[in-house]
């Protein structure tokens, strides 16, 4: 846990607070005058924010959500990555969804910064998180007439697992920058991405990896400067958006290390996600599904395309200039594909 805390501290220390203006796609203004109305809503007093009680085997805790907009036919719940990251990495959605009249919900999962953070490692379990999402869905009144579930990275794992158990509640499913197998992700990292690195840099990184010296400041510096800026968000560190900086600053390392492990080159150690794989179950998903991949991601975009073909009703969208956080480093392509999918599903257009 200490090494992950150091990693995020090093990242934040290197980052400046300057923000780069983001590209925007041209979208017609929303003509629905009721999009911002709070009429008939119970969250006006808090500006759309709602704390939702979540029942777990270890007690009841509260998770943070925030609604933006009104649309009875399109409601998108955003599942952040990490695990243990925050909704802050999705703040750029404010630049694209409102003018399309898309209602959407920010949500910090249990353990994340804006929600309760119980000190019990047994809670950081995929199956429990699935039940948490179901409780959030019920509390927000989402159903198969309007409920689109978006998940990126770990959020994509959670979205797949939710669909495998509760797809009857979904209108649409979006899996962004995630493959259906952690072992496949690790193989891609070891056999494809690692050999592309500068040999001297890779050799030095592997010295620390082999020694499990993940807290070494030199290791962290190498990871940030030679891996993050190539495969996590393809921008110079000084141009990383403030929302990303805050997301890293607020990440809960206890959740992250328990599920993901301490290494940035795959899921290692006794991390609970180490052997996660749902490839043989995807064919049971009937919900219209979008898989978003990126050319420079930490994971194989071809596997993301395979995912789209494996589900019964899928579409693949590639962000050719993007990496893991393609909503920032290939923003125009990312949102054009995402918005088009939501529109097509809403209008009944075949994928």
Question: Which stretches of residues belong to each language-model region?
Answer:
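Conserved alpha/beta-hydrolase
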Residues: 97-116
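Conserved loop-alpha-helix segment in the C-terminal half of the alpha/beta-hydrolase fold
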Residues: 279-321
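Conserved hydrolase catalytic core segment
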Residues: 145-188
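Flexible "cap/lid" loop of the alpha/beta hydrolase fold
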Residues: 173-214
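Catalytic active-site module of serine/aspartate enzymes centered on a nucleophile-bearing elbow/loop
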Residues: 314-351
């Amino acid at each position: 846990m200490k090494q992950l805390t150091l990693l995020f501290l090093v990242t934040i220390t290197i980052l400046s607070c300057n923000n780069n203006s983001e590209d925007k796609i041209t979208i017609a203004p929303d003509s629905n005058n009721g999009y911002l109305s709070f009429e008939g809503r119970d969250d006006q007093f808090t500006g759309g924010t709602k704390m939702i009680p979540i029942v777990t085997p270890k007690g009841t805790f509260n998770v943070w959500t925030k609604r933006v907009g009104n649309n009875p036919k399109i409601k998108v719940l955003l599942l952040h990555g990490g695990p243990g990251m925050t909704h802050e990495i999705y703040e750029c959605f404010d630049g694209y969804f409102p003018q399309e009249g898309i209602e959407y919900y920010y949500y910090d999962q249990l353990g994340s910064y804006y929600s309760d953070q119980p000190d019990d490692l047994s809670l950081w379990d995929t199956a429990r998180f699935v039940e948490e999402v179901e409780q959030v869905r019920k509390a927000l009144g989402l159903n198969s007439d309007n409920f689109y579930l978006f998940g990126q990275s770990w959020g994509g794992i959670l979205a797949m697992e939710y669909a495998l158990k509760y797809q009857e509640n979904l209108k649409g499913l979006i899996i962004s920058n995630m493959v259906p197998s952690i072992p496949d992700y690790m193989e891609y990292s070891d056999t494809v991405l690692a050999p592309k690195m500068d040999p001297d840099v890779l050799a030095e990184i592997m010295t620390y990896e082999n020694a499990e010296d993940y807290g070494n400041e030199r290791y962290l510096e190498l990871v940030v400067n030679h891996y993050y800026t190539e495969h996590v968000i393809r921008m110079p560190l000084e141009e990383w958006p403030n929302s990303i900086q805050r997301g890293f600053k607020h990440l809960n390392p206890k959740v992250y290390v328990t599920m993901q492990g301490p290494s940035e080159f795959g899921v290692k150690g006794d991390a609970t996600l180490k052997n996660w794989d749902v490839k043989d179950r995807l064919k049971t998903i009937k919900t219209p599904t979008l898989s978003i991949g990126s050319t420079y991601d930490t994971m194989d975009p071809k596997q993301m395309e395979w995912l789209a073909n494996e589900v019964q009703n899928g579409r693949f969208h590639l962000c050719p200039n993007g990496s893991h956080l393609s909503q920032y480093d290939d923003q125009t392509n990312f949102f054009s594909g995402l918005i088009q999918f939501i529109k097509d599903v809403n209008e009944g257009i075949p994928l």
